[in-house]
């Protein structure tokens, strides 16, 4: 009986950690992480909350989606599962290669005119360190939604200096260097 109680106690101690997602974003996937991402994508077909850990909203109601390598591969597996297909090795390689070593961020910003975001400049703050993007694509012809224009912007940052566990701040500035939007990105809550 005592042995049973000890085993039960050990099981209770370790139970919350078994099967839980990794507690940090990874910018380069190993084979185990690739399989986990594919499995998560396949399972997500029946879940409406897929992608929640990679999305954020700021006080102004603007949205941000972080595309980590795990998220990209899980999304590819999800899309294949919707079609009743499995991912081919070539598809896996493509999904991993396009996001490996990068932090890709999709941001939807709101403004008064169709071209308001054209010259916006993003920067990622890691403490006091500013990380400049390697690629910026600001939408020049924003769509009108709910009386304001919504511009979908794509920003790619190098992940070489980023750990996977920190909190970062994405700051978007206008050409006059005035902050127009900020987002908190919690990498420790993402895979």
Question: Predicted segment positions?
Answer:
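Positively charged n-region of N-terminal signal peptides that target proteins for export
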Residues: 1-4
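Bacterial N-terminal signal peptides
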Residues: 7-17
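Conserved functional micro-motifs across diverse proteins
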Residues: 22-191
């Amino acid at each position: 009986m005592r042995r049973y109680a000890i085993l039960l106690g050990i099981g209770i101690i370790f139970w919350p950690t078994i099967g839980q997602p990794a507690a940090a974003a990874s910018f380069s996937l190993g084979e185990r992480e690739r399989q986990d991402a594919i499995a998560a994508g396949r399972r997500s077909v029946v879940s409406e909350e897929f992608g929640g850990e990679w999305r954020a909203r700021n006080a102004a109601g603007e949205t941000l989606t972080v595309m980590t390598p795990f998220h990209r591969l899980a999304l590819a597996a999800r899309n294949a599962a919707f079609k009743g297909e499995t991912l081919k090795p070539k598809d896996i390689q493509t999904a991993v290669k396009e996001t490996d070593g990068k932090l890709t961020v999709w941001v939807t910003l709101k403004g008064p005119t169709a071209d308001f975001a054209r010259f916006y400049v993003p920067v990622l703050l890691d403490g006091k360190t500013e990380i400049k993007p390697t690629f910026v694509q600001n939408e020049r012809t924003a769509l009108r939604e709910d009386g304001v224009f919504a511009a979908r912007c794509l920003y790619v940052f190098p992940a070489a200096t980023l750990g996977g566990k920190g909190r970062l701040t994405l700051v978007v500035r206008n050409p006059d260097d005035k902050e127009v939007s900020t987002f908190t990105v919690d990498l420790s809550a993402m895979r």
